[in-house]
């Protein structure tokens, strides 16, 4: 994370189930006069349904658009396509990768922080998931991938809100929040949203996300924002659910977070899609950590649980360290760095969020707490 990112091109990974509205959003990116030059990478040009009227020039896999953006296809090697874009004259304001045919966004995201050459020139900016508000309950019953896409996302666009009632939308919002407690959520119809609100946000970079929102990991920040085409009244204030009911002000750090499935079963009837969710979030909060215990622990747990960990992110306070340590990971890949000095009066505590499947909360919590500096070694 300590690498300079000033000259790097931000990369947005766009995911979402068939019919969620990705094509509509991509056509907007490739046609609107937004003054930016984006490169859009799709799996198959014909499949994604880009409007042919937008094309002014085509050169093998690269398609020039009327507004200066380009669209290119990837057949196999994503890295080769990205490197080809980097060699083109001029500079792109951003790269958007659409995951058609690649239901799992994780391998695409990993490309941008595993390959040294690509990483030197680009930076993963955000993973954006589009959700079909009308059909999400059915999608969750049919597809594990639909749930993974939400769980892995930094930003979720709940689209087609004009096709559901306010009550149905409230349930969809609860489901999305239960799957991914830290994602920023926007409600839209016809994928209508100011592109500046979802592109070049630095959402995947935990350091920048924390700079933009110091309470990013607190799970209670209000972030339901309507797109310009969303006409719903969202004054329901999370529908009466207290998403901060996890009571993170305990000082014994031994509280049971098993209710991080958010207890929504009590809020909706037996048909609620919440019952179909298999992804859970595990939130840990402790005191100052001993680095000699913490680093071997995080390495061990990610090696053991890696396939089940979709995302992990956190802020760690190390005893005797005057700077906050920010850590994030995907599956078995974890990276971290110091972010900034602790402020006067700021509570020096450690917070860590795991999002994944079949995670043993009690085991993770117990071993995490054993990394605290004041805990005696047995």
Question: In which residue ranges do the predicted regions lie?
Answer:
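Nucleotide-state-sensitive switch-loop elements of NTP-binding domains
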Residues: 2-140
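Flexible, charged surface loops at secondary-structure boundaries
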Residues: 33, 90, 150-151, 319, ...
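Phosphate/Mg2+-binding loops and adjacent switch elements
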Residues: 88-197, 202, 206, 210-213
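Flexible loop/N-cap segments at domain edges
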Residues: 354
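C-terminal accessory "lid"/substrate-recognition subdomains
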Residues: 2-3, 164-343, 347, 357-378
